[in-house]
């Protein structure tokens, strides 16, 4: 067992002694931080354009914001716009900015929407009783049938 662990321990020691080479990532510099900040700023500007286009579409709707068939197209367009812009700037999606825009959308347009679900109630007692007693009565019948059929096959063999 110790022989199997020896290569793993050597690899772990190498990773601990040379962490930068094992990760194969250059050290971040102030220039890379500045360029990343510019990318995020550019993406934020693009996200604001997506948001403005979405708001324009939603303002055309007459406050029927809880009907999914009405709002699905502008909502999907917003999500697609945020995703495409994230890809343009080589950012992942979803990302914190996109999540913030979508969260703001939900707060602004969908905060008064609630999922309408029918209230479930118990069936009438006679139906409930039939649903309980029917399987209870069928169990002895099926047990008898299985035992009878299994005895018939034992006699033939």
Swiss-Prot record:
Residues exposed to the Extracellular side: 25-125
Major place of residence: membrane
Membrane topology of this protein: Single-pass type I membrane protein
One Pfam family it belongs to: RAMP
Glycan attachment residues as annotated in the record: 67, 112
Transmembrane stretches, start-end: 126-147
Keywords in alphabetical order: Cell membrane, Disulfide bond, Glycoprotein, Membrane, Receptor, Signal, Transmembrane, Transmembrane helix, Transport
Subcellular location(s) per record: Cell membrane
GO BP term, example: negative regulation of endothelial cell apoptotic process
GO molecular function, one term: coreceptor activity
Cytoplasmic topological segments: 148-157
GO CC annotation: cell surface; cytoplasm; plasma membrane; receptor complex
Secretion signal, residue range per the UniProt entry: 1-24
InterPro entries reported for this sequence: RAMP (IPR006985), RAMP_sf (IPR038126)
Source organism superkingdom: Eukaryota
Metal-binding as UniProt keyword: no
Positions of disulphide bridges: 50-81, 66-113
Keyword Membrane among record annotations: yes
SUBUNIT field: Heterodimer of CALCRL and RAMP2; the interaction forms the receptor complex for adrenomedullin/ADM. Heterodimer of CALCR and RAMP2; interaction forms the AMYR2 receptor complex for calcitonin/CALC and amylin/IAPP.
Entry's family note: Belongs to the RAMP family.
Known function: Accessory protein that interacts with and modulates the function of G-protein coupled receptors including calcitonin gene-related peptide type 1 receptor (CALCRL) and calcitonin receptor (CALCR). Required for the transport of CALCRL to the plasma membrane. Together with CALCRL, form a receptor complex for adrenomedullin/ADM. Together with CALCR, act as a receptor complex for calcitonin/CT/CALC. Together with CALCR, also act as a receptor complex for amylin/IAPP.
Stated name of the protein: Receptor activity-modifying protein 2
Organism: Cavia porcellus
């Amino acid at each position: 067992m110790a022989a199997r662990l020896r290569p793993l321990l050597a690899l772990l020691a190498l990773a601990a002694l040379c962490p930068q080479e094992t990760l194969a990532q250059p050290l971040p510099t102030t220039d890379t931080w500045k360029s990343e900040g510019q990318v995020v700023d550019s993406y934020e500007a693009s996200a604001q354009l997506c948001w403005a286009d979405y708001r324009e579409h939603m303002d055309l709707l007459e406050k029927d914001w809880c009907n999914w068939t009405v709002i699905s197209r502008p909502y999907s367009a917003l999500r697609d716009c945020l995703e495409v812009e994230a890809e343009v700037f080589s950012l992942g999606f979803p990302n914190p900015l996109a999540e913030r825009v979508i969260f703001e959308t939900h707060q602004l347009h969908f905060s008064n929407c609630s999922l309408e679900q029918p209230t479930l109630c118990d069936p009438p007692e006679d139906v409930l009783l039939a649903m309980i007693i029917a399987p209870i009565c069928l169990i002895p019948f099926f047990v008898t049938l299985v035992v009878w059929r299994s005895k018939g096959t034992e006699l033939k063999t």
